[in-house]
């Protein structure tokens, strides 16, 4: 068995193939010594509930294209599907009206952060928002909503849409603060970020992590 192991390491031209062969041989050694029937299998997949690939991740609307950054990832572990969205508000504009949608200046439409679907995110059972960087330039009291419509516009009231309040901060965010969602986006809803206070401006900072937890339906 040791000879077979060494041969596998020496003979594999692909280093990843060598690692796989080595692990397979180690499994054989353990099984022979213990009478077990261990096997190699993939525990996690970087995918959505139905094996979504990088080409089918959430896509932000044109109305927030000026945002400094936007990143989305899915992880499936067993039947648990976790969706993570990191947004940077830098470059976007908040009006001077409470619960107005934040987005590109000039009332840009489709100021959403992606559509939540069961196929990608699973059937939702929970969610939370974490402040990674305290907003500056605009209000630091930021709220999170979802809505049926994708057409919500910067400087427009999110309450003019068919909306659901996910997280209302009730005051200024602090770095590292996490708030659980008091309600969840309905399937096929779009995500929006809004002013939580009547204070406007162009954001020069403000990063948030939005997490959604679901199960493979």
Residue ranges and their predicted role:
Residues 2-217:
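Surface-exposed, low-hydrophobicity beta-strand/loop segments enriched in small/polar/acidic residues
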